[in-house]
UniProtKB/Swiss-Prot annotation:
The keyword Kinase applies. GO terms for biological process: nucleobase-containing small molecule interconversion; pyrimidine nucleotide metabolic process. The gene is cmk. The lineage of its organism: Bacteria, Bacillati, Bacillota, Bacilli, Lactobacillales. Disulfide bonds: none annotated. Keywords: ATP-binding, Cytoplasm, Kinase, Nucleotide-binding, Transferase. This is Cytidylate kinase.
Amino acid sequence: MVKGIQVAIDGPASAGKSTVAKLVAKRFGYIYCDTGAMYRSVTLAALERGIDLSQDDLVSELANQITITFAPGDPQKVFIDGHEVTQAIRSTEVAQHVSTVAAIPAVRSRMVELQRQIAQEGGIVMDGRDIGTTVLPDAPVKIFMVASAHERARRRFLDNQERGIDGGSIEELQRAIELRDQKDSTRAVSPLVKAADAYQLDTTHLTIEQVVDQIAGRIEKTLKQK
């Protein structure tokens, strides 16, 4: 039996990373680790406690105090200190502030530490902004997913509709996504960049199934070489 490998999937906001990562994990019987949900959880906890997000030390202290856990489900369930926050972390307010929290060095180092612990055994699919560059730099399969800002806004809009969330129009979502891209790619700590050895996959005109098949093909090829 070939031991499972680490699969790193990176890319900008709303590129479809989580959806694809979950399906890839399911296909191979791997664990799925939603790193974005971890940063969203810290953001939600800070907002609920009325912590000023510009106070790096207070937010970092909180990140070290709370326990973030996952449980199987569709969608995968997320808990902060035992309380389910699966829907709450997807709110527009959390989405607007998560880049600020994720840019705090001490928060990132704490999350990276937790993510590496989860990934130690292999057989894991992890998606985020800096998995292939910072969290799992030695992952044998690295994918960098991209799509046009308009297509990502359209997908987010449909996703919001499905969840019954009023997250604004496609145009408003596109502006928010472009702002998020700029924040993510220019931050000082672990900016959003493609790892030198990552495969860039433009999903603008691909179906979810086509994206999953392409990534699965790369995993199978890597497993054969082991």
